[in-house]
Amino acid sequence: MAASPKINRREHILQCLATMLETNPGQRITTAKLAAEVGVSEAALYRHFPSKARMFEGLIDFIEESLLSRINLIMDEEKDTMKRCQHLLQLLLIFAERNPGISRLLNGDALLGEHDRLRSRIGQIFSKIETHLKQILREKTLREGKGFNLDEAILANLLLAVAEGRISQFVRSEFKQKPTTHFEEQWVFIQQQLLQS
């Protein structure tokens, strides 16, 4: 008889937390509810994480690692400015769509009433993404000698706001309004506007 695979309890706790964020939109997650979902005592949770904030930080680490590593691939593999921007935004939207519970963290909805440093960490992730967008837009100016009519920082902020708005709609609709719906058509319009500037 084969031995059952050993469960990484820490990962299992984070998976349960993400699932609870998805299945309980708008509700606060308590350690008691999480322990019940995981099937352990609250004390057992605290053997793996010293606090609930550290559990959320575990998910935020996953978000940051997943997004930024893929953004770096986009930066390495794609050289066209508009395609880079499109792929970066699509990555963010697809990631949110595939991870509805985690999209509540990106949106900040699940962090209301939690430690301030958690909201700061999410803010830092979005700042890094915006910095990548600025870099992409500035490189176009350097490569082609022709920039945009608006400052690249303003354009990068606008592009990120589009993605953040789509994620916000996704959370507000309780995951019914997918962030990628109509993005292709919207991107065609956005790209036309950017290239006219």
Curated annotation (Swiss-Prot):
Keywords: Cell cycle, Cell division, Cytoplasm, DNA-binding. Residues 30-49 bind DNA. GO terms for biological process: cell division; negative regulation of division septum assembly. It comes from the Bacteria. It is found in: Cytoplasm, Nucleoid. GO terms for molecular function: sequence-specific DNA binding. PROSITE patterns: HTH_TETR_2. Residues 7-67 form the HTH tetR-type domain. Belongs to the nucleoid occlusion factor SlmA family. This is Nucleoid occlusion factor SlmA.
